[in-house]
UniProtKB/Swiss-Prot annotation:
Homodimer. Its EC number is 2.2.1.7. One of its GO terms (biological process) is terpenoid biosynthetic process. SUPFAM superfamilies: Thiamin diphosphate-binding fold (THDP-binding) (SSF52518), TK C-terminal domain-like (SSF52922). Its cofactor is Mg(2+); thiamine diphosphate. This is 1-deoxy-D-xylulose-5-phosphate synthase. The keyword Nucleotide-binding does not apply. It comes from the Bacteria. GO terms for molecular function: 1-deoxy-D-xylulose-5-phosphate synthase activity; magnesium ion binding; thiamine pyrophosphate binding.
Length: 629
């Protein structure tokens, strides 16, 4: 059978191992062809091809439920669930999403873009199944990196106390999340992974299997058939941690051996209780460059399949904000040993990899554990260190309570750098950094800022570190504007001080962060209509520079705010509140992201759809204030 002929995963039923292996080759070929052309997540999907095929041969996907953690691993799933012909549109506007999405396919049982959610969701489905009296299977597939997340461990703790609730958790152990995994759990899994087999399953498990009505007597023989691949240690006991938590542990087994995977999954389903199947895979399997550099090929822009090298853009791009942040923080750390960079499994993405390589003693990776990262930083600041926590805007949402309870209330000097703030593009609604202005603005004691360019980023970083209280600095995804930066001697900003970029008396545009550049372009278009705009770079959303903004607004009487974030509770709302609190009755036109989810597309396509391109904003400003007769 050809992969292109698969329209339903149940068509895998009855296929031989050799037929499944042929489909596996076709999946990798299609996966590589599409990602090399348009970009996307490469290594994770290549590593779970055999796992996916084997698992789906043991399930009826019209009834059974599978929850894939994060969705990085979901490309093979998409290719065998009716999206082969549309796969060229991966991560493109109106195309196939890069993550699982319930609205896209009935086989996407649960959507996810953030890690560590799968076991909770699958357990919830299992509990609902049992209460309804149904009998479908529920499976969670989670990577070893995601298993470091507290939510996953909370779910394991809960599921283990439900011994009569059938649930299969497949641990896809490739010893790699996005960055190399960290922590004691990772070290434990590594010991399990390399340990020799001493005993196959415990006598108690075999005995419990025998006691299953009708089918119990047949299972031990089936289990014996997979003795070579499903292993369990006696001393030290492999899987002891999971078994103490109430799971039956099976593994570790070869995640690329389809025959043994099928037998193992069938055995796991028959146990009718919480089972953890430990599958060892190779991230990037089948593509030598991805196997050799599992971090670099986790996700890729378009690249040459033959050489494995990225296809350079036609025009050289300025250095990214993330890299400039990392380079600047490294310089600061070299001058001050009390400054420590903290990341949650995103060293490369946040630019902290340069700190990790050069001054590892001033670098901490906590794994996929944002809540822990925030409170860890709070504790460090209590005893004189100066923590700088670099986390994507979308992931910091996961630690909102810690931001309030552990940092804000205690007014601790922790610096947060929110990477990927604003519209991020192809990763879609789970990754858009559109909420941080709103959720951070409500926390007392925090100072919030966003730079207009790379140089201002450097000044804001030193301002944050020097400030005796909590700060949050948001930076956008992608390249900077190409302005000159300094290697040292950055001048701190005065907290809450804005600047006038351009004078004008017809309209006042107050822009925040990345939207300052767009405001300048918008003003140029307005100028061609003989409309002169005054442009203010707010720099800070909290505190606002009321001494600058209110007199300008009172004089010009027409105000526009621009932000790359949700309008609800955002920067524009802060301006409206400022005017209202000071009894200034001035019309304000807020431009930003309305109350919608921003789907996957290129950043410019998303901005155009939202009306955030300069020509659109200029046109809407003119219409709003009737500036042209």
């Amino acid at each position: 059978m050809l992969l292109s002929e698969l329209s339903h995963p149940n068509q895998l039923h009855g296929l031989t191992v050799s037929q499944l292996e042929e489909i596996a080759c076709q999946i990798r070929e299609r996966h590589l062809q599409v990602v090399s052309t348009s970009g996307g997540h490469l290594g994770p999907g290549l590593g779970v091809v055999e796992l996916t095929l084997a698992l789906y041969q043991t399930l009826d996907l019209d009834f059974d439920k599978v929850v894939w953690d994060v969705g990085h691993q979901g490309y093979p799933h998409k290719l065998i669930t009716g999206r082969f012909s549309q796969f060229d549109s991966l991560r493109q506007q109106n195309g196939v999403a890069g993550y699982l999405k319930r609205s896209e396919s009935k086989f996407d049982h649960f959507g996810a873009g953030h890690a560590s959610t799968s076991i909770s969701a699958a357990l919830g489905m299992a509990i609902a199944r049992d209460r309804k009296g149904d009998n479908y299977k529920c499976v969670a597939v989670i990577g070893d990196g995601a298993l470091t997340g507290g939510m996953a461990l909370e779910a394991i703790n809960h599921a283990g106390h439900l011994p009569n609730t059938p649930l299969v958790v497949v641990l896809n152990d490739n010893d790699m999340s996005i960055s190399p995994p960290v922590g004691a759990l990772s070290s434990y899994l590594n010991k399990v992974r390399v340990s020799p087999p001493l005993q196959f399953l415990s006598d108690s498990v075999q005995e419990s299997v025998k006691n299953i009505p009708l089918i119990g007597k047949d299972i031990p023989e089936e289990l014996k058939n997979i003795k070579g691949s499903v292993r369990r240690l006696s001393v030290p006991k492999v899987g002891a941690v999971f078994e103490e938590l109430g799971f039956t542990y099976m593994g570790p087994i070869d995640g690329h051996d389809i025959g043994n995977l099928v037998k193992t999954f069938n055995a796991a389903h028959k146990l009718k209780r919480p089972v953890l199947v430990h599958v060892v895979t190779t991230k990037g399997k089948g593509y030598p460059y991805a196997e050799a550099d599992q971090v670099g090929y986790h996700a890729q822009s378009a690249f040459d399949l033959t050489t494995g090298k990225s296809i350079p853009s036609k025009k050289p791009k300025p250095v990214s904000y993330s890299k400039i942040f990392g380079q600047t923080l490294l310089k600061i750390c070299e001058q001050d040993s009390k400054v420590v960079g903290i990341t949650a499994a995103m060293a490369t993405g946040t630019g902290l990899d340069i700190l990790q390589k050069n001054i590892p003693d001033q670098y901490i990776d906590v794994g996929i554990a944002e809540q822990h990262a925030v409170t860890l930083a709070a504790g460090m600041s209590c005893d004189g260190l100066k923590p700088v926590v670099a986390i994507y805007s979308t992931f910091l949402q996961r630690a909102f309570d810690q931001l309030i309870h552990d940092v804000g209330i205690q007014n601790l000097p922790v610096s947060f750098v929110l990477d990927r703030a604003g519209i991020v593009g192809a990763d879609g609604p789970t990754h858009q950094g559109q909420y941080d202005i709103s959720y951070m603005r409500s926390i007392p004691n925090f100072v919030l800022m966003a730079p207009k360019d790379e140089s201002e980023l450097q000044r804001m970083l030193i301002t944050s570190i020097n400030h005796n209280g909590p700060t949050a600095l948001r930076i956008p995804r992608g390249s900077g504007l190409g302005v000159a930066i300094m290697d040292e001697g950055w001048e701190p900003l005065n907290i809450g001080e804005a600047e006038i970029i351009e004078g004008g008396e017809d309209i006042l545009i107050i822009a925040y962060g990345s939207m300052v550049a767009s405001a300048i372009e918008t003003a140029k278009i307005l100028k061609n209509m003989n409309i002169n705009a005054c442009i203010v770079n707010a720099r800070f959303v909290k505190p606002l520079d009321k001494n600058l903004i209110m007199p300008l607004a009172s004089r010009i009487q027409k105000v526009v705010t621009m932000e790359e974030g949700t309008l609800i509770g955002g920067f524009g709302s802060a301006i409206v509140e400022l005017f209202n609190d000071n009894e200034i009755n001035i019309p304000v036109y807020r431009i930003g992201i309305p109350d919608v989810l921003v789907d996957h597309a290129s950043p410019d396509q998303s901005k155009e759809k939202l009306g955030l391109m300069p020509d659109q904003m200029a046109d809407n400003i003119v219409k709003k204030f009737k500036l042209v007769n």
